[in-house]
């Protein structure tokens, strides 16, 4: 995917949501888009996936302008996992994953044996074949997210786009999902994911973009982009980058001025109480 000078607003009278967005990713890349709440990450994810028309600029998939592609053609190249998917019907897990074959099946046709085998292989790839007969609605949040990822893999896309994929997952399931994204990239899939957590980029990403003030304030490798200065610009707090024994870094937030504010409030409360 290549994104060139992309800007977007919901209509001509609405303020710009983001502007001058530029990046490209290749086979095996994982791009993590970081930024505070309300900065436009989800809108950007939907725009590059073809759900919104850009005001200006172009989004290219394998060299083709996404505006010139049908949703079916996009679905054959891009697998999309939205934020906080809530199941509506108690489908079996296997049937949910089999739905990923929809771009390849005519509306009047039924899935072929080849489609079923591809769906089964997607479950095997993620190590969740044992869930195939279970009801999707009865799964835990972490299991549902893995099943949805299997459904996307059944599409056989070149690119995964994930909007805050670890949202509502406990710590263990967050790590498992990020490790799975990294493993899939090692198999040649490209991925774009949004997150609130810089540590997610250190764990799984080869490229990072920080989104703030309607655009990317930096783009590059995690080592280049995730500096203490950039993280302060993005989130308004001081952090310390700590290097672990395996040369991996983590972000440790330092104390904010909240402690001072609460201390002053407490003193004022005690004075008023007298």
Predicted regions and their residues:
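The feature captures the beta-strand-to-loop junction immediately N-terminal to the Walker
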Residues: 34-36
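Helix-to-loop junction immediately C-terminal to a conserved catalytic motif
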Residues: 49
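Conserved ABC transporter NBD signature motif
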Residues: 57-65, 74
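Conserved ABC ATPase "signature" region
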Residues: 98, 113-131, 156
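Conserved ABC ATPase signature
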Residues: 135-139, 143
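Catalytic Walker B motif of ABC-type/P-loop ATPase nucleotide-binding domains
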Residues: 160-164
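ABC ATPase nucleotide-binding domains
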Residues: 234-274
């Amino acid at each position: 995917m290549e994104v060139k000078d992309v800007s977007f607003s919901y209509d001509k009278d609405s303020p710009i949501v983001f502007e001058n967005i530029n990046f490209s990713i290749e086979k095996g890349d994982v791009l993590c888009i970081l930024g505070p709440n309300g900065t436009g990450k989800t809108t950007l994810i939907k725009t590059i996936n073809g759900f919104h028309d850009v005001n200006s600029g172009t989004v290219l998939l394998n060299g083709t302008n996404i505006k010139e592609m049908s949703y079916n053609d996009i679905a054959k190249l891009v697998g999309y996992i939205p934020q906080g998917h809530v199941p509506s019907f108690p489908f079996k897990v296997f049937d949910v994953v089999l739905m990923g074959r929809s771009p390849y099946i005519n509306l009047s046709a039924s899935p072929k044996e080849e489609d079923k085998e591809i769906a089964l292989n997607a479950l095997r790839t993620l190590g969740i074949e044992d869930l195939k007969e279970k009801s999707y609605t009865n799964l835990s949040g972490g299991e549902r997210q893995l099943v949805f990822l299997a459904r996307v893999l059944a599409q056989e896309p070149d690119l995964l786009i994930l909007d805050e994929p670890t949202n509502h997952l406990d710590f263990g399931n967050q790590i498992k999902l990020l490790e799975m994204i990294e493993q899939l990239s090692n198999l040649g899939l490209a991925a774009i994911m949004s997150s609130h957590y810089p540590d997610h980029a250190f764990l799984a990403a080869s490229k990072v973009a920080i989104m703030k003030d309607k655009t990317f304030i930096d783009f590059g490798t995690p080592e280049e982009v995730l500096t203490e200065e950039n993280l302060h610009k993005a989130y308004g707090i001081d952090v310390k980058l700590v290097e672990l024994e395996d040369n991996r870094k983590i972000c440790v937030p330092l104390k904010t001025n909240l402690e001072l504010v609460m201390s002053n409030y407490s003193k004022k409360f005690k004075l008023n109480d007298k």
